[in-house]
Amino acid sequence: MTKKVFDDISRLALKALLYEVSLSPKPGLVDQLDNGAHDDMSFLTFVDSALALAPFFNTYLDIGFYHAKEDPGLIFERLRVSGIEAEQAMFSATKGVNTHKGVNFSLALLLGATGMYLASQPQLLAHVTAFTEEDSLAICQLVKPLTAHLLETDFGSLDLKKELTYGEKLFLDYGIKGPRGEASEGYPTIAHKALPFLRKSLRSTDQETAQLQLLVYLMSIVEDGNLIHRGGIKAWRQVKQDMLLLHNSSLSTADLKAALSAYNDKLIQKHLSPGGTADLLVLSLYFAFLENQL
């Protein structure tokens, strides 16, 4: 029974990756229509990458489920080791192109947390798509003890380092914590913003439109390290402002797609890509599938 459930949940994670790359148009991002602001990857690159990562999703679930009573730091290390193996498989499939490194990190944590949660909620093993909003929130909260050490380990001694990564510079200069911060706080953007927004949208519109609306909403609120890396703080803030205006407008699906297509052209010209937003969209879709919202 457990293996079948884990197979089903793993497919939902893969489905989330495929839905995200298929959603079109997405400004600056790879989709079915074009490669966005990327010249080294395509829609098919993302499909290859997703399929390469998929076999590891069961492993993440297994680690969380069968080691649920271990120290959270040890569980994190187990997930990290498997995550690196998955990352290597991704790079092999994409010939060295980084398509899903960030979201693989988050999926390892959230699938691991899902396994941990199932170990304490055996009744859910009989009904994979019977997860509630409370279940999703609890899974996000389980990531907090897994990553309690993460910010201190990665950012605690930056003043002693001679060479800093871009993420480390962002933290020192602006206090932006990126994916590490989101994880260490239990994915509040997903649990308290993206999922409530998506659930509400799905009550009043179709699935595709709801996902496009969620994309716009996320672009208006997310601390997107990819955008900042490519264009700086000013460009990121401008994108947020532009998307907030679009978010607050009441457009038909056709007009929304037209607006997103036009903004895609703008971001391509500026070589800007909201990859952080794309990752959070994937994670939001994963939970929506678990809850049978989509």
Curated annotation (Swiss-Prot):
It catalyses: 3'-dephospho-CoA + ATP = 2'-(5''-triphospho-alpha-D-ribosyl)-3'-dephospho-CoA + adenine. Its EC number is 2.4.2.52. The keyword Zinc-finger does not apply. GO terms for biological process: prosthetic group biosynthetic process. Keywords: ATP-binding, Nucleotide-binding, Transferase. It comes from the Bacteria. Transmembrane segments: none annotated. One of its GO terms (molecular function) is ATP binding. Belongs to the CitG/MdcB family. PANTHER family: 2-(5''-TRIPHOSPHORIBOSYL)-3'-DEPHOSPHOCOENZYME-A SYNTHASE, TRIPHOSPHORIBOSYL-DEPHOSPHO-COA SYNTHASE. This is Probable 2-(5''-triphosphoribosyl)-3'-dephosphocoenzyme-A synthase. The lineage of its organism: Bacteria, Bacillati, Bacillota, Bacilli, Lactobacillales.
